[in-house]
Amino acid sequence: MTQLEYALSGIITKEMKIVADYEGVSEEFILEEVKKGEIVIPANVNHINLVPKGIGKGLSTKVNANIGTSDAFPEIGKEIEKLKVAIDAGADAVMDLSTGGDVNKSRREIIKNSSVPVGTVPMYQAAVESISRYGSIVAMPEEFIFKVIEEQAKDGVDFITVHCGLTLESLKRLKDNKRIMNVVSRGGAFTIAWMIHNEKENPLYQYFDRLLDIAKKYDVTLSLGDGLRPGCLEDATDAAQIQELIILGELVKKAREAGVQVMVEGPGHVPIDQIEANVKLQKSLCHNAPFYVLGPVVTDIAPGYDHITAAIGGAIAAFAGADFLCYVTPAEHLGLPDIQDVKEGVIAAKIAAHAADIAKGIKKAREKDLAMAKARANLDWNEQIQLSIDPEKAEKYRVTKNKPNVETCSMCGKFCAMQIVSEYLGTPTTSC
């Protein structure tokens, strides 16, 4: 049985109990929201060392880190290092997007070494292997994509991105409404190329019931991908994007009726003034399914700093109701991220998620900031460092920017605002 089926039967699973304890909410709350499909717990029955996380209504905003090999950098060992760095930095989930080297080995090693939920885009493996087996992506038999999905599910993948909303009708909208950047989703591009070449409907849409059977067998959460997400601000919230979202909403209902957990993916590149509308549209059209957004990036002119542009958009999206942020690294739009890029991407996304959680009233988020304020008031540098979202960096600055065994910081010294006001108020003297 899936987590959704257990919830519908009124059974609180061990995964639900773990999520409730982590979030500081009741087990009954988790049960009810999983039952409604407004919380998902990606937890493949074959992911043995998983510590489950909940995604959705009333929970802390979660962060995903993308890792995986490429044709230029096929070394699996590096991706395992990235996995460990991502988890240490606070990632709540990872996705293996490997397209280079032995993609099966890469996925299995990541699952084996990951305590957090692992996601994939099965179409990547299907495309890579179709080139070697059949000569091209478009020559891939329909059967092959389902074979790959079953193989990945059997390995223990907790959630899969599937571009089921790409239909012939969606492509008509894309053709009729010109974009600056037509399609920027790799999985979406592979699917569209196959559809156009073969003049056939998307197999993942046409045979959605078959996909549901596989997902149900292993309790794989479906992450309905946005193959027509905007790749630049000018293309945001257009007819093609919304047409796909409407279809995804219909598929959400089908998945829930089949007892399969489901969430929905979103953009992308979106100007600040359109982010809230995008979230509200998704929640309305997709029946309050958990919303998983890539950023969104709020300006197109900051390559090298897109972890910042995405954090800005992510904070706004999460406050508006998005539940799951996919990180963006400084290497986005430029190349495959290295280990440091992964760390910076996770931390930027965690800051965005935490800032939104404070505004959304997530109790434990506000408590962390209160603890930091008290540590600063008490001039407790060790506590401040431990409470930091990146203790390693905070400690490095404290040690290198100040003289040893000095309470004050080098920014203010004897002109410390807290010290001056404390003397006036007659309160215990502190310095910052």
UniProtKB/Swiss-Prot annotation:
Question: What positions does the entry give for substrate binding?
Answer: 66, 95, 124, 163, 185-187, 226-229, 265, 292
| Cofactor remark | Binds 1 [4Fe-4S] cluster per subunit. The cluster is coordinated with 3 cysteines and an exchangeable S-adenosyl-L-methionine.
Q: Which organism is it from?
A: Caldanaerobacter subterraneus subsp. tengcongensis (strain DSM 15242 / JCM 11007 / NBRC 100824 / MB4) (Thermoanaerobacter tengcongensis)
Which keywords does this Swiss-Prot/TrEMBL entry list?
4Fe-4S, Iron, Iron-sulfur, Lyase, Metal-binding, S-adenosyl-L-methionine, Thiamine biosynthesis, Zinc
Does the entry feature the keyword Lyase, yes or no?
yes
Provide the function of this protein: Catalyzes the synthesis of the hydroxymethylpyrimidine phosphate (HMP-P) moiety of thiamine from aminoimidazole ribotide (AIR) in a radical S-adenosyl-L-methionine (SAM)-dependent reaction.
* Domain of life according to the entry: Bacteria
* Positions that bind [4Fe-4S] cluster: 409, 412, 416
Which HAMAP family does the entry link to?
ThiC
Name the protein family: Belongs to the ThiC family.
Under Gene3D superfamilies, the record lists:
6.10.250.620, Radical SAM ThiC family, central domain
One Pfam family matching this protein: ThiC_Rad_SAM
Q: This protein is called what?
A: Phosphomethylpyrimidine synthase
